[in-house]
Regions:
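A short, active-site helix/loop in glycosyltransferases that binds the activated sugar's phosphate group
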Residues: 1-29, 38, 73
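A charged, aromatic-enriched C-terminal amphipathic alpha-helix characteristic of glycosyltransferases
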Residues: 174-205
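Acidic donor-binding loop of glycosyltransferase active sites
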Residues: 104-117, 130
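Short alpha-helical segment that forms part of, or immediately flanks, the ligand-binding pocket
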Residues: 100, 122-127, 141-142
Length: 207
């Protein structure tokens, strides 16, 4: 609180942070998206797969915070119901390099059940063309003034909703190329690291 009161400006990189600060510091709070350097990222638009490859990363110490403790059992229910139409790739407490390698082959990533917006991890996945099932509320699109792209499969923190969204993907695999292409476009449009860096510089110089 003391830092927020005495600083010249506040930059919120997520909608969640923005709505927390803006009521109290409306004159010095701004929103600037997270930066993604995709210069070394291989972007690949997914084709319609024979089997949907669902990817879930689990950090044992943070499973309840990220919601993977709820999503993972539901994902296994889907795989049990549709064994010939989907498979699961898990990264449990995996080193970052291995985690990224496993993500590269995924069609859909499950991440951040309780979030309104995509995390850094989700944005990295999207930059690769991986579809994210996680936080993607309308507030996320409104704050960046995105009118058309809707690449994120938004999910609510309920087992029923998670099941329905996962089942929708399995039964509508033809949408995977479209959502994958939108994911790449979304990151390049709103999270270009050079563009974001310039926004930081502009805000700094103005304050």
């Amino acid at each position: 609180k003391e830092i927020a009161q005495t600083c010249n400006g506040i930059i919120a990189c997520l909608w969640e942070y923005y709505v927390a600060y803006i009521p109290y510091f409306p004159d010095k709070t701004t929103f600037i998206p997270l930066p993604i350097d995709y210069s070394n990222i291989t972007s690949r638009v997914r084709t319609e797969p024979e089997k949907v490859n669902f990817f879930i990363g689990i950090q044992s110490a943070r499973s309840d915070i990220k919601g993977t403790d709820i999503m993972y059992p539901v994902l296994k229910e889907i795989q049990k119901k549709y064994p010939d139409q989907c498979r699961i790739t898990e990264a449990i407490d995996a080193p970052y390099a291995i985690y990224q390698k496993l993500m590269d082959d995924a069609d859909v990533q499950l991440d951040q059940l309780y979030s309104y917006t995509p995390s850094m991890n989700s944005l990295l996945a999207m930059a690769k063309g991986v579809i994210v099932l996680g936080g993607g509320e309308e507030e996320n699109y409104e704050i960046i003034n995105e009118k058309e792209l809707r690449p994120i499969i938004n999910v609510y923190p309920s087992e029923e909703d998670i099941f329905q969204k996962l089942e929708y993907i399995v039964l509508n695999k033809e949408r995977i190329p479209e959502l994958s292409a939108q994911s790449i476009e979304y990151v390049r449009k709103h999270h270009n690291y050079v563009k974001v860096a310039q926004q930081y510089v502009d805000f700094w110089e103005a304050h």
